[in-house]
């Protein structure tokens, strides 16, 4: 059974393997053992209540409960920008007009922004290519909503997610090449590494301080503003179906979109509910896939089951109960994995 659980120190080797498969551009999952070890330690200190809100971050892994193999990672930052500034570009408009000359130009413009300061962030989502089947990607992404629903007081009103922008297999980013490189005087991979290892002071020191007309960028760079990496496109669709929207904020490095949603409007959070669990053989039937998660903060588990999403009593096998770290009589959180398609 594939389950989501909190990260552990022993996961470092598996996370190094995952980091080596990202293809670059995933700033929060670099193949750097010291950085990953520090990330794990920060997550464990978050669970133990040792960190202030601005440093808190949860990390989860997707594990095969029978073999112990790890095939994916996902994370939540509790409140971004409280320690280090959180930068985006806001894609806005400046109008230049002259009645005398009968000229009116509305120009797309990039404005440096800290508007998402204090928001909770979904981040570090990566699934091993060999595991991209059987709903694993949905489980990995949406399990975080089950954790947020169970422990709502730990998170803020707005949730954001930075989507990886367009970068080729050689690490070439059209947006960075046309804009960032002119100010930072380094390749995208170098800037990405510095940011991923926590060396972020250079951003504030070297960022352009004034609005930038997108017409001054190359056509190639303009074309990728707000667009996602091909491997990230499915993740974007998943979040949009949960209620997330692109509100014209983009990443300062690769131009990828930032999606956002009020936490209480996220479908899986809003529609999830607690049901009693019982041991037995689940009833046969054409039931949809559902997310199920325990309510145990320190030993959180989430998995997929086939069930009636409206049931008040969820029947699970002994193996499923064991994998979810719960017993008959406990209450678990249940929600349909995907929103029902509207029919006319």
From Swiss-Prot:
PANTHER family: ARGININE N-SUCCINYLTRANSFERASE, N-SUCCINYLARGININE DIHYDROLASE. GO terms for molecular function: arginine N-succinyltransferase activity. This is Arginine N-succinyltransferase. The lineage of its organism: Bacteria, Pseudomonadati, Pseudomonadota, Gammaproteobacteria, Enterobacterales. Succinyl-CoA binds at residue 125. The gene is astA. InterPro entries: Acyl_CoA_acyltransferase, Arg_succinylTrfase_AstA/AruG, Arginine_N-succinylTrfase. Keywords: Acyltransferase, Arginine metabolism, Transferase. Catalyzes the transfer of succinyl-CoA to arginine to produce N(2)-succinylarginine. Coiled coil: none annotated. It comes from the Bacteria. The keyword Secreted does not apply. NCBIfam families: arg_catab_AOST (TIGR03243), arg_catab_AstA (TIGR03244), PRK10456.1 (NF007770). The active site is at 229 (proton donor).
């Amino acid at each position: 059974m594939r389950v989501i659980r909190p990260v552990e120190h022993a996961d470092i080797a598996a996370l190094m393997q995952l980091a080596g498969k990202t293809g670059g551009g995933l700033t929060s999952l670099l193949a750097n053992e010291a950085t990953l070890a520090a990330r794990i330690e920060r997550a464990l200190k978050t669970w133990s209540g040792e960190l202030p809100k601005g440093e808190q971050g949860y990390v989860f892994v997707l594990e095969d409960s029978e073999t112990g193999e790890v095939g994916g990672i996902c994370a939540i930052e509790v409140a971004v920008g409280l320690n280090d500034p959180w930068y985006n570009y806001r894609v806005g408009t400046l109008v230049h007009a002259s009645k005398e000359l009968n000229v009116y130009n509305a120009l797309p413009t990039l404005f440096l922004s800290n508007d998402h300061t204090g928001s909770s962030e979904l981040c570090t989502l990566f699934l091993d290519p060999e595991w991209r089947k059987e709903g694993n990607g949905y489980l990995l992404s949406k399990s975080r909503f089950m954790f947020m629903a169970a422990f709502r007081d730990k998170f803020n009103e707005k949730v954001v997610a930075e989507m990886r922008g367009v970068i080729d297999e050689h690490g070439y980013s059209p947006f960075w090449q046309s804009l960032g490189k002119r100010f930072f005087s380094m390749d995208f991979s170098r800037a990405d590494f510095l940011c991923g290892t926590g060396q972020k002071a250079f951003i504030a020191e070297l960022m352009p301080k004034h609005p930038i007309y997108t017409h001054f960028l190359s056509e190639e760079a303009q074309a990728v503003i707000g667009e996602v990496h091909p491997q990230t496109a499915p993740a974007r669709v998943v979040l949009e179906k949960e209620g997330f929207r692109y509100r014209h904020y983009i990443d300062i490095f690769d131009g990828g979109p930032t999606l956002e949603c009020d936490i209480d409007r996220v479908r899986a959070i809003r529609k999830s509910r607690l049901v009693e669990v019982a041991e037995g053989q689940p009833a046969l039937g054409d039931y949809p896939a559902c997310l199920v998660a325990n309510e145990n903060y320190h030993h959180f588990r989430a998995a997929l089951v086939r069930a009636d999403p409206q049931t008040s009593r969820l029947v699970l096998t002994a193996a499923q109960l064991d994998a979810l770290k719960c017993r008959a009589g406990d209450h678990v959180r249940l929600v349909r994995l995907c929103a029902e398609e509207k029919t006319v």
